[in-house]
Curated annotation (Swiss-Prot):
This is Small ribosomal subunit protein uS7c. GO terms for molecular function: rRNA binding; structural constituent of ribosome. Its main location: plastid. It holds the Pfam family Ribosomal_S7. SUPFAM superfamilies: Ribosomal protein S7. It comes from Euonymus alatus. Part of the 30S ribosomal subunit. NCBIfam families: rpsG_bact (TIGR01029). GO terms for cellular component: chloroplast; small ribosomal subunit. Keywords: Chloroplast, Plastid, Ribonucleoprotein, Ribosomal protein, RNA-binding, rRNA-binding.
Length: 155
């Protein structure tokens, strides 16, 4: 038996301004080459633009956007008897949020526009309204899962 103590579970830190874990998750996904201050700058500018566009709390728009993009089910490739099947699997809340954030950032990076803050704010507002590339990605994933429902027993 090991004599070492059990490791303490790390809790995700919240950001200095909004004190929100979702904001921190988003910043960590925006982050490139270790430039965290730049990632914070991009997100805060995007939040300011959301405030100007919608005249509502940008944090509630962010929550609504992530809630709208979060998938309930996804497909996972599973090799059975020499052929690969797309098997639908349920997704937990944390993994779903992580996927939603990844899709939102991917969609905003693909958008044409001036800078990342502008593109991110536009994508978040669109996702909160129920449109945009990230929402399309979620619907496509759900369609794939529905189409491959016959393989659900391979889980």
């Amino acid at each position: 038996m090991s004599r070492r103590g059990t490791a303490e579970e790390k809790t995700a830190k919240s950001d200095p301004i909004y004190r929100n874990r979702l904001v921190n998750m988003l910043v960590n996904r925006i982050l490139k080459h270790g430039k965290k201050s730049l990632a914070y700058q991009i997100l805060y500018r995007a939040m300011k633009k959301i405030q100007q566009k919608t005249e509502t709390n940008p944090l509630s728009v962010l929550r609504q956007a992530i809630r709208g993009v979060t998938p309930d089910i996804a497909v996972k490739a599973r090799r059975v008897g020499g052929s690969t099947h797309q098997v639908p699997i349920e997704i937990g809340s944390t993994q779903g949020k992580a996927l939603a954030i990844r899709w939102l950032l991917g969609a905003s990076r693909k958008r044409p526009g001036r800078n990342m803050a502008f593109k991110l704010s536009s994508e978040l507002v669109d996702a909160a309204k129920g449109s945009g590339d990230a929402i399309r990605k979620k619907e496509e994933t759900h369609r794939m899962a529905e189409a491959n429902r016959a393989f659900a027993h391979f889980r």
